[in-house]
Amino acid sequence: MAKVIKQQYSFPHPPETVWEYLTKPELMELWLMKNDFQPIVGFDFHFKTNPIPSLNFDGICHCRVLEIVPYKKLSYSWKCGPGAGEITLDTVVEWRLYPTDKGTDLFLEHSGFDKEENLNFYIGMTDGWLKNLEKMAKHLNTAPYGTTNA
C-alpha cells in the first residue's frame, strides 16, 4: 500500500508571502535545500544536500514542476537514488495554500512511497518535512515584513 506524508502548518502571513518561500530559490534554500527551482510548469530542477549512503541517496533530488496555481497550489515530481542516473524513489510533492482570517494554512502532501524499499525514505522524510516546515516558520516570522519605525 502506498504511503503518503501529510503535514499542515498555519502561518500569520498572507498566501502571497508564504508562496515566496515555496517558489523563490534563495528563500527555499533557507528552510529546505540548495536548488535551481524556477516556477515554470515543465521546468526541471534539483535540490542538493548531503548524500545519505545508508538510504542509497546521492544527495540530489531530480524534480520537475507539474502544476502551478499562483498563491494556491504548487506540485513537482521528486525523484532520487544512489546516483549514476538510477532512480529508486519516484514521488510527488504538492503544496496547497488557503487564506484564513489569521494568515495562511499550508498543506503538504508528499505521495508515491509505494515500494517497500522506500519505507526508510518515508520514515525519514515524514520527520524531515515537519522540521523543514518549522524552519520555514522561523524564517517567515523573523523576516522583515511590513513597515518599521525607522
Give the positions of each predicted feature.
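Short hydrophobic/aromatic-rich beta-strand segments that constitute the beta-sheet cores
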Residues: 45-47, 73-77, 106-108
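Short beta-edge strand/loop motif at the mouth of beta-sheet-based domains
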Residues: 6, 26-60, 149-150
